[in-house]
């Protein structure tokens, strides 16, 4: 959180539940007046990777189109963008939905999480497996040096 809202953390028990929660949040954001082109979904995985909760997902028409890696178009058109964390490094968006998190402790995971979680200008929403709650709590404590 820099100048924006409090970070939202969302636990899930299955990829299906994660997908449902992500789509529900997108609907809520759209109903609150956030435009599709302000929303970026980040994942360690490509959307065509079975590890992504959006793999083979049918996206309801009220949510609109989700496009992959639309560089140079961050402020145009009316669609939600999907990037891998590595592809989005150095870029920013008003709203970031960070999905498909594998962990919080491993050095590679921590670096990937840092890159993803530092991309939001206003709102960051983080989706992680419920069994990672203890790791997330440790990460939070360590980041505050407690």
Segments (PLM) and residue ranges:
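Core RecA-like ATPase module of SF1/SF2 helicases and allied nucleic-acid translocases
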Residues: 1-146
């Amino acid at each position: 959180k820099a100048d924006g809202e409090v970070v939202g953390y969302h636990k899930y028990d299955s990829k299906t539940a994660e997908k449902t929660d992500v789509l529900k949040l997108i609907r809520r954001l759209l109903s609150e007046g956030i435009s599709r082109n302000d929303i970026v979904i980040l994942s360690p995985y490509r959307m065509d990777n079975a590890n992504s909760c959006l793999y083979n997902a049918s996206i309801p028409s009220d949510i609109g189109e989700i496009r992959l890696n639309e560089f140079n178009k961050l402020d145009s058109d009316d669609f939600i963008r999907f990037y891998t964390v590595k592809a989005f490094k150095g870029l920013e968006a008003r709203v970031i939905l960070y999905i498909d998190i594998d962990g919080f402790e491993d050095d590679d995971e921590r670096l990937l999480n840092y890159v993803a979680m530092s991309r939001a200008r206003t709102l960051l929403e983080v989706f992680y497996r419920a069994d990672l709650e203890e790791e997330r709590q440790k990460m939070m404590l360590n980041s505050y040096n407690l």
